[in-house]
Each structure stands twice: as C-alpha cells, then as structure tokens.
Amino acid sequence: MTFFGFLFSLNKVSDQNLKIKTLTIQNSLIFLVCGFIIFTSNPFSRSFPPNVEGSDLNPLLQDPGLAIHPPMLYLGYVGFSIVYSISLAVLILKKKTDFIKILKPWVFISWTFLTAGIGLGSWWAYYELGWGGFWFWDPVENASLLP
C-alpha cells in the first residue's frame, strides 16, 4: 500500500485537494493495517507442541508458478486500495471533476496484476492437481475468474 501511495504521490494530479485527501485516506489505511498487525501478531510466540517432523513445504506447492502467483494477487488486491482512496476522496470532497481519468490507470494496473495472478493459479491448478479442466472446479474456484 505504501508503494502505491508513493506512486500516486509522484502522479501529476491537477487538483491538489484531491491528491492530499487521497494520500490521507491511503495513509490511514496503512496505519490501520500496521496497527492490526502490531496488536494481533507476535513473531516470538512459540507453537506447542513443537513440530516433530520436518517443516518443509508440501511437494505440490513447490512449483515456480506458485512463487509468482501469490505476489501477483497481493499486488492486485493492494493496488485497489489506491482506487478506494481516490474514490472516497472524490466522495468526501464532492468534486464534479472527471475523476475517471485519474482512476483508470490505477484500476488497469491492479486489474492486470489480479488477472495475471488468477491466471497463474488456474494454470498451476490445471496441470498440477489434475482436476480435469476448469469446468470441474467447484463454484468457489470458478468465482475467482469472474470480474
């Protein structure tokens, strides 16, 4: 989220109030996520009982496609946070400007990452798990392909 906020701050937006409000909302989202992580996660907690066997990754998950698939999905989901921030800023400021021109590149970038991530995941599931094709998946897996 910080990276997308930084990229938006470099963007030339004609309305400075919109830019300031968007970055304020984006930074508030970052603050909320960081606060949630700080107060709910403890990296020093011990797991009981300790692992008796090795803690290797499942062999099905040891695939080059899965090294790219989750980060692509993450970039897509996080990329939509700046779209949310711009949309909320326009609603708060009650601007009549053509904010679609501002939103369009951010939506396209985020959508591209999501599409690539879902495509990689679908490709991996098709050849690795042998599910027999996309039409034999259950509805949850097919719903990820919907816009």
What feature does the model see in each segment?
Residues 1-147:
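Polytopic transmembrane helical bundles with strong interfacial aromatic enrichment
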